[in-house]
Amino acid sequence: MLRWIVWRDLMLAWRRRADMLSTVFFFVIVVSLFPLGIGPETQLLRTIAPGVVWVAALLASMLSLGRLFANDYQDGTLEQLLLTPQPLFLVVLGKILAHWIVAEVPLVLIAPLVGVQFDLSRETLWILFVSLLIGTPVLSLIGSVGAALTLGLRGGGVLISILVLPLYIPALIFGAGAVEASVMGTSPSAHLSLLGAFAIVSLLFSPWATAAALRISLE
């Protein structure tokens, strides 16, 4: 069931490639605006790079959260999935995994390329990649709860932002902190460990919370 959900959502996302590309373009544009606006101040660029890239990734991931369950809700597929004998949290976990692959993995892969604009070293670019690889699943996991709670509501995109942005703060602090530690020449292992722990906690609780929120929204 989990594999089928992931494959189905990936195929649907491939048919709507423009949505995926818009997320990537938004991320690239937001990150690229800062070097253009600040100019060739390499030390300043290296200082602000961790926060800029992580905030851009956070905002870009939110662009697609509203579509996480909306399409299946509108065509009735979500209600049919709710009636299947399979546990709902498996359906939710499959959709979260597909969302991460479609919306977050491209950002993780392209982040080191846009990070070059900030004059980051190879080691720091690697830490940037690793921090996003560990941290972006958190964005999809926590974001799914907000998407489920606001399902079918008018102005749901704004409500999702209000609900999930405060919960993203630990991931932002630990992820950007790991990159900043690398920029400063210190070990990022503590920040990466905390980010990994936060990701594990999110994985344990978010699918269940999202499944419960979907049941409430569909009643």
Kindly label every feature range from the protein language model.
Residues 1-23:
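Aromatic- and glycine-rich beta-strand/loop motifs that create alpha-glucan
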Residues 37-48, 112-133, 151, 178-194, ...:
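Membrane-interfacial helix-loop-helix connectors in multipass membrane proteins
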Residues 49-65:
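Long, hydrophobic alpha-helical segments
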Residues 93-118, 138, 142, 175-176:
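Hydrophobic alpha-helical transmembrane segments that constitute the membrane-spanning cores
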Residues 126, 133-165, 215-219:
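A structural motif at transmembrane helix-loop-helix junctions in multipass membrane proteins
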